[in-house]
Design a protein with these regions (language model features):
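Polybasic/polar functional segments that serve as interface/processing modules
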Residues: 1-143
């Protein structure tokens, strides 16, 4: 089976394990690609240390039973924020932090049997926000 990535010469070690599986989700009689959680963490701690942030996102992915493929994190200087992403076989988790505002924006998009809600306690423990705003989107709704 040819896909767009293989046409570009990009291959994943996980490709053979997941090829042919349907990772769409069915919930409440609706079928869709996956659940995308958008989190705004206000009054958050630990928003400067890229190693701690990467560990937190890895722990969050593991709590959701996701498969981590790659990670990349960038630190914007000693007192600057961090932007980073975990690429998952089931989609991604990304973060952008603004330490000057004690703020972190986190996206968790997962398909298949992973449960992105299981990531939330891990993130709450690490970042200890005063306020959390959470919204859920069902991506790829089948008409």
């Amino acid at each position: 089976m040819t896909n767009a990535l293989s046409m570009l010469g990009i291959f994943s070690d996980v490709q053979n394990e997941i090829e042919g599986k349907d990772y769409f989700v069915e919930k409440d009689g609706v079928k869709f690609a996956g659940t995308h959680l958008l989190l705004d963490l206000w009054g958050a701690s630990n928003v400067i240390d890229p190693e701690l942030i990467e560990r937190a996102l890895r722990d969050a992915a593991e709590a959701a039973n996701a498969t981590i493929l790659h990670s990349h994190f960038h630190h914007f200087g000693p007192d600057g924020g961090v932007s980073g992403v975990l690429v998952l076989a089931e989609s991604h988790i990304s973060i952008h932090t603004w330490p000057e505002r004690d703020f972190a924006a986190i996206d968790i998009f997962m398909c298949g049997v992973c449960n992105p809600y299981h990531s939330l306690p891990v993130l709450k423990d690490v970042f200890a926000p005063k306020t959390i705003t959470l919204s859920e989107q069902r991506r790829g709704l089948i008409p």
